[in-house]
Amino acid sequence: MDSSGTDSAKELHVGLDPTTEEEYATQSKLLQEFINIPSIDKAWIFNSDSGSQAMFALSQANLLANKKKKFMLSGHISNESNQSVNFHWAPFPIEMTGASAFVPSPSGLKLLVIRNPENESPTKFEIWNSSQLEKEFHIPQKVHGSVYVDGWFEGISWDSDETHVAYVAEEPSRPKPTFDHLGYYKKENSLDKGIGSWKGEGDWEEEWGEAYAGKRQPALFVINVDSGEVEPIKGIPRSISVGQVVWSPNSNGSAQYLVFAGWLGDKRKFGIKYCYNRPCAIYAIKFTSDEPKDDDANEFPIHNLTKSISSGFCPRFSKDGKFLVFVSAKTAVDSGAHWATESLHRIDWPSDGKLPESTNIVDVIQVVNCPKDGCFPGLYVTGLLSDPWLSDGHSLMLSTYWRSCRVILSVNLLSGEVSRASPSDSDYSWNALALDGDSIVAVSSSPVSVPEIKYGKKGLDSAGKPSWLWSNIQSPIRYSEKVMAGLSSLQFKILKVPISDVSEGLAEGAKNPIEAIYVSSSKSKENGKCDPLIAVLHGGPHSVSPCSFSRTMAYLSSIGYSQLIINYRGSLGYGEDALQSLPGKVGSQDVKDCLLAVDHAIEMGIADPSRITVLGGSHGGFLTTHLIGQAPDKFVAAAARNPVCNMASMVGITDIPDWCFFEAYGDQSHYTEAPSAEDLSRFHQMSPISHISKVKTPTLFLLGTKDLRVPISNGFQYVRALKEKGVEVKVLVFPNDNHPLDRPQTDYESFLNIAVWFNKYCKL
């Protein structure tokens, strides 16, 4: 056979032609520069006579390993007499290979490092002092599995004496039935260890859905850091999944309690990731370090401290131990919205350690329904700092969404007064990382600015109220010239878009303008034409797109795309009226809001109507596929990441079937495990697939095989229907990814393809 032509022919992967391959090569180099930008995740401050020492936890995508590389960066903080502050950084960061969690002790003299195994090996606990490893304990699987470090059930807490650490870990595997070579059942205590025996599967146990596949029940443990002895805490019903444990104050020889959040999962465990509407409470159980191991658990009963409220999480004790503070998502639990406006509460903690039969819950921050223009819109937090207190003992610092930004607030626990600690004139997003006395160490970023470390010194304003003077900290983090060049010409602003459907039945807060973050190049329109525009839609729908830095979106901006990042009604940060206006109207009100924002940009002359694309994931993918069906001539290309395309087929296989009912009907009363024909008809009617006959927009689909939230079959059904119609589609499937599609290689390949796909139809 003549093979003379094969040497010059190039092997191209599916879907590539030589021109596209060249573009892949060009775009991949720039994208990698952006992907390499590290995240500043956490910080700890250690005080000494010579000043404060800061330790920062950072993470960076490792494309080769397809994991995040974690490392520590440390520096000395010196406050100068002229009110300036200097950070003196260590010359190099230190990689923390295999470390799952770092937890300094209250004094700062010890550091706990936890290393979770990737198999059935023991979990490692390491106790470090300032110069060396003091102790190392290996906790076998028969005691417990991996420690929870998920940011939700996660809770790792030192006691005040620094002799014990309480934490949440997977309970040990429950025994499975064993059968011999003939198939006969073998009793658990059987002495017959004959060859050929095998284990069955045993009873199925429900998990907490997306991101928790294969994870066992979270349970509470205490380790003695001197002896390494681990004690499982008895008396907690298995129907309660525990998390977020802290120690109660230990004063006057009073009894000490473990205080934690608990989620009930006795009837069904719905998906809990991103879902604040799962009922939960703050519990307390007494702990005595010299407790005999055979004591009856009833001698130390569990106390529900928040019986009168449907939600309680993130427990924190005030510095003086007088108050227990917690966050509540009762509005989400009571309404059914998966996230809604939160509230903050406090409980008086008894100095004698004797818990009353019922506790008086005091409201500190109540739910805001209709915020006045420029005023506090309500509380939207994902968690609290481990030590969020100023020196006065009653001022708590937290980070929350405030319209299209994230801000830092100071909350007076006694009066409930809320004041903004981050600059009130800043449209950047701010996140408090740690407190240095009354000063704040924070990170700030915007869609066009990489994350920067900030240091805020507390002072008083002209009215005598607390205010913070912020300093820029010269970070040792270096960014590539290509990244800085790509960002140098970018700018952003927040657009207010008046809504059109101001009906009488609409709540007042739902009549306010929506917001959209417009990101563009200062060089746009130099040739009289606007850059192509990407309409960017967040998921949820009860989530928000803040003015913060995203590596991948900044990459798309740097290659010539303007962005319109739309916070439609139903988003967080705008008060409860606006949020609750969407349920029952998904696929309609949110679609109209998105089209309104796009048309507003066109009318302002900042968008070319012939070069508009749309990008969204999850509910943002729901909106993306709705938009190309309801406005088939509006968008030249689309990209959807794990989109909801058909609620009727999703409801029976998702980990959150309640979401389908709530967003379709607007309340919880219709929920059932057996949807009726009428339910399925309504779901179909409100889904993008009901508009598929009108779709003609070329669409890229990015799907994760392990997605439990919007299982891959939902996207495939829509894709095949488009192919049947002859619509151009491209599909990328990531076999080891779940809903977020956030593994480094997946994130990289996804946005590389999004860029090339959009370039093809916008003719960049």
Curated annotation (Swiss-Prot):
Annotated EC: 3.4.19.1
Phosphoprotein as UniProt keyword: no
Sorted UniProt keywords: Cytoplasm, Hydrolase, Nucleus
GO term, biological process aspect, one: proteolysis
Molecular function in Gene Ontology: omega peptidase activity; serine-type aminopeptidase activity; serine-type endopeptidase activity
Regulation: Strongly inhibited by the serine protease inhibitor diisopropyl fluorophosphate.
Residue numbers annotated as active site: 618 (charge relay system), 707 (charge relay system), 739 (charge relay system)
Localisation: Cytoplasm; Nucleus
Activity sensitivity to pH: Optimum pH is 7.0.
Catalytic activity: Cleavage of an N-acetyl or N-formyl amino acid from the N-terminus of a polypeptide
Nucleus is among the record's keywords: yes
GO cellular component, one term: cytoplasm
Bridged cysteine pairs (disulfide): none
Miscellaneous field: Plants silencing AARE show enhanced ion leakage after oxidative treatment.
Family: Belongs to the peptidase S9C family.
Function: Catalyzes the hydrolysis of the N-terminal peptide bond of an N-acetylated peptide to generate an N-acetylated amino acid and a peptide with a free N-terminus. Can degrade the glycated RuBisCO (ribulose-1,5-bisphosphate carboxylase/oxygenase) protein but not the native protein. May be involved in the elimination of glycated proteins. Plays a homeostatic role in sustaining the cytoplasmic antioxidative system. May contribute to the elimination of the oxidized proteins in the cytoplasm.
Subunit structure: Homotetramer.
Identification of the protein by name: Acylamino-acid-releasing enzyme
Organism this protein belongs to: Arabidopsis thaliana (Mouse-ear cress)
Source taxonomy: Eukaryota, Viridiplantae, Streptophyta, Embryophyta, Tracheophyta
